[in-house]
């Protein structure tokens, strides 16, 4: 469903394009695959991972990646019929 929302945003011109299943590797060999890397028409970009439940493993890898690189991984969760991104 989030994928469909991204497609609609591309058609509306809000998003230029997006990549899915983007691997981010750490020197330790740890890898986190982020669901979406979104490139907006105003030049911004965001990493957004769609989650039902936040597992301890995901939270640990997210922290390791954010500590190692100058990026922030946002979380998308569906609440009712709306998406919440934080």
State where each predicted segment sits.
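Electrostatic, structured charged patches in enzyme active sites and in nucleic-acid/phosphate-binding
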Residues: 1-86
